[in-house]
Amino acid sequence: MPTIQQLVRKGRHSKVVKTKAPALKGNPMKRGVCTRVFTTTPKKPNSALRKVARVKLNGGVEVTAYIPGEGHNLQEHSIVLVRGGRVKDLPGVRYKIVRGALDTQGVKGRQQARSRYGAKKEKK
């Protein structure tokens, strides 16, 4: 244990918490413009073609964001809303695009977890 004199000299340092989504700069979401929409393959042992987009955010930072859900209407110059949240099997992808906001359409025919994918309730 330190002496009182040592604490007077140095003091206690609180741990610095590193943010998991630095490009958002503390905001819950940020708007951006798609610069490139493409597919990429996940790490082993998974196998797929994951849909991702390079997005230039309003702060000037360019990030890679995942496009969740089945099918999308995004292309270059689409305006999107980006939130934090990494994709475990895609290295370097720490953001997700919000479905059903701005230029991004919701997932068609989605029955469960509709609010996450911007899907409207289907009429019977």
From Swiss-Prot:
Transmembrane segments: none annotated. One of its GO terms (cellular component) is small ribosomal subunit. Disulfide bonds: none annotated. Keywords: Methylation, Ribonucleoprotein, Ribosomal protein, RNA-binding, rRNA-binding, tRNA-binding. InterPro entries: NA-bd_OB-fold, Ribosomal_uS12, Ribosomal_uS12_bac. The modification 3-methylthioaspartic acid is found at D89. Signal peptide: none annotated. Residues 105-124 are annotated as: Disordered. Part of the 30S ribosomal subunit. Contacts proteins S8 and S17. May interact with IF1 in the 30S initiation complex. Belongs to the universal ribosomal protein uS12 family. With S4 and S5 plays an important role in translational accuracy. Interacts with and stabilizes bases of the 16S rRNA that are involved in tRNA selection in the A site and with the mRNA backbone. Located at the interface of the 30S and 50S subunits, it traverses the body of the 30S subunit contacting proteins on the other side and probably holding the rRNA structure together. The combined cluster of proteins S8, S12 and S17 appears to hold together the shoulder and platform of the 30S subunit. This is Small ribosomal subunit protein uS12. It comes from Kocuria rhizophila (strain ATCC 9341 / DSM 348 / NBRC 103217 / DC2201).
